[in-house]
Design a protein with these regions (language model features):
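Catalytic cores of nucleotide-sugar-dependent glycosyltransferases that transfer UDP/GDP/TDP-activated
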Residues: 1-354
């Protein structure tokens, strides 16, 4: 197949501003190339990824959906990057069999009927916007099988979707993550530093248990970051910045557990499978797609949402988790090969539907 991937417009690939969908796009791209498909990626200027074919487009970045209210009207900045990216798609679509949209934004769905080449939409978050909900539902009805999600829990946040709905999960290059059987007395927290990620609860755990917390990720909300540090002045933590996969796994693999504290319905949680690949159990609120990744009591613990006491209690049970079981779980379900099979089947099905 000749595939055109269109990235998120909230930041350059490799910057971390796109969150988990950046890693998903990267891994899917690597796997479809390995499978012999022709691929071009359309992405914001400044995107940097090793040896992947990227057409860089200039323009002003789109505001991330998480920062907006549900009722906020659809808007774009002047010289909008999102519109510029899709104008490029319009110019070159005839050269491709399928366009794959990774942007969680209204415009690509709206433009779908005006393009001659079929468009697959990989929806990377749960419901956040009334206007976006409406057009996703309309697209699922009008263009059968073109909407894909990470998990059923994520898809369930959208009303009245039309079948078939594709649940594609995620996957990683397991060779990049080294197993560690003997961790240090430390915990990890990994993700965008933004209110919906609930980092303050992980700091509360560190403060209560006196176990050092290693924090990694892009600071997306500086005022929030400053406030939670002030709220927990004595919590033992170290902020390490936004790290490459190689650097990140070197830290995570030496931790007793990864703590995940989402305030919202996580569509998936790529950092969870990255931790499991290192043999690191995951302690998480039982919310969204994370409940489909973590096997409670075997590869980590699922805790009542927003219960810091539950997180603290779970840290006491980490010795009963076999870290090899965590690694085995990642290898069985979340390999690049399995990811490639799921996406390739989806792409073929769409082309069959459209024909």
């Amino acid at each position: 197949m000749r595939l055109l991937f269109v990235s998120t417009p909230v930041g350059p690939l490799g910057s971390g501003f796109g969150g988990g969908v950046e890693l998903s796009l990267y891994n899917i791209a690597k796997e479809v190339i390995r499978r012999g498909h022709d691929l071009q990626i359309v992405a914001p200027a400044g995107s940097r990824w090793d040896n992947l074919p990227i057409m860089q487009i200039s323009g002003n970045l789109q505001i991330i959906a998480q920062s907006l209210e549900r009722e906020t009207p659809i808007t774009m900045p002047s010289n909008p990057l999102l519109a510029n990216m899709w104008d490029y798609v319009r110019q070159v679509e005839s050269e491709y069999d399928l366009v794959v949209n990774f942007a969680y934004d209204w415009l690509p769905f709206y433009l779908t009927p005006f393009l001659k080449t079929p468009v697959a939409h990989f929806v990377s978050m749960g419901s956040l916007s009334d206007a976006l909900d409406q057009i996703i539902v309309q697209t699922s009805k009008r263009f059968s099988g073109t909407i894909g999600f990470y998990t059923p829990a994520q898809a369930a946040t959208f009303p009245e979707l039309t079948s078939p709905i594709y649940y594609l999960s995620s996957g990683i290059d397991l060779s990049l993550y080294q197993f560690c059987s003997q961790p240090k007395e430390q915990l990890a927290w990994l993700g965008r530093i933004s209110p919906e990620k609930g980092l303050e609860d992980a700091l509360a755990v560190a403060n209560s248990t006196n176990i050092s917390l290693k924090i990694m990720g892009k600071i997306q909300d500086e005022s929030y970051w400053q406030k939670i540090q002030q709220d927990y002045p004595n919590a033992p933590f170290e902020y390490l910045g936004f790290l490459s996969t190689k650097e990140m796994q070197q830290v995570v693999r030496e931790c007793r557990a990864l703590i995940m504290t989402p305030r919202w319905v996580e569509a998936f949680g790529n950092v969870a499978i990255e931790a499991l690949a290192c043999g690191v159990p995951v302690i998480s609120y039982s919310r969204g797609g994370l409940a489909s990744i973590i096997k409670d009591g075997k590869t980590g613990f699922l805790v009542e949402p927003d219960s810091v006491a539950g997180l603290i209690e779970a840290t006491k049970g980490l010795n009963q988790i076999n870290r090899q079981t965590c690694r085995d779980s990642a290898e069985k379900v979340f390999s690049l090969e399995a990811l490639g099979e799921r996406f390739e089947k989806w792409f073929v099905d769409i082309l069959n539907f459209q024909s």
